[in-house]
Design a protein with these regions (language model features):
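Short, Lys/Arg-rich N-terminal segment immediately upstream of the first membrane anchor
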Residues: 1-5
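Function-determining sites in protein domains
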Residues: 6-11, 20-176
Length: 176
């Protein structure tokens, strides 16, 4: 009888643990959109930094369909790691669901994971892929430490994107 009681207790414990795990998974933030869907590079946002590398705001440029394809091809060659301890310093891409846009590009497999990184407080129909070497930012008394998808050697990637989109030239024009 004791052995039967232990088996029942074990089964009850396993079921209870499974129920707790299911409840935790249910509260985990889920992406709004299907990760296997088709996305586009809608715009490239890039940081306008002050003389002391203080955040002044960001600018954006709208890539042509050809430039967007070139950008996605560039990204596939970079090592990607998840990071939660730094903010981007220079630029990020906005990826929007193509159902709202006319230009469509297929999201690379490695990039599909990036759309799971989202802010549950801001459930807009887009996901930011953050690129570049980063640092913590303090603005208006708040420290910004959101998770983002970091690209190794972000400065090199910035230079390659600059060759496509002429980001530095645009920033210089705006500063003049």
């Amino acid at each position: 009888m004791k052995k039967k009681g232990k088996i029942i207790l074990t089964v009850v414990l396993v079921v209870a643990i499974a129920a707790v795990a299911a409840a935790v998974a249910a509260f985990r933030p889920q992406p709004v959109l299907d990760p296997a869907g088709t996305y586009e590079v809608q715009r490239v946002n890039y940081w306008l930094e002050g003389p002391n590398l203080e955040w002044e705001g960001y600018l954006h440029t709208m890539p042509t369909p050809e430039q967007a394809q070139e950008i996605l091809a560039l990204l596939e060659g970079y090592e990607k790691t998840l990071s939660a301890d730094r903010l981007p310093q220079r630029l990020f891409l906005n990826l929007l669901p193509a159902q709202f846009q006319s230009m469509e590009v297929q999201l690379p497999e490695w990039l599909e994971a990036a759309i799971f990184i989202w802010d549950p407080e801001n459930q807009d129909d887009y996901f930011n892929l953050i690129l570049g070497d980063g640092h913590v930012q303090i603005r208006d008394g708040y420290t910004y430490l959101p998770p983002y998808y970091e690209i190794s050697n972000g400065q090199q990637l910035y230079q390659e994107l600059d060759a496509i989109l002429h980001l530095d030239q645009r920033m210089a024009e705006l500063r003049d």
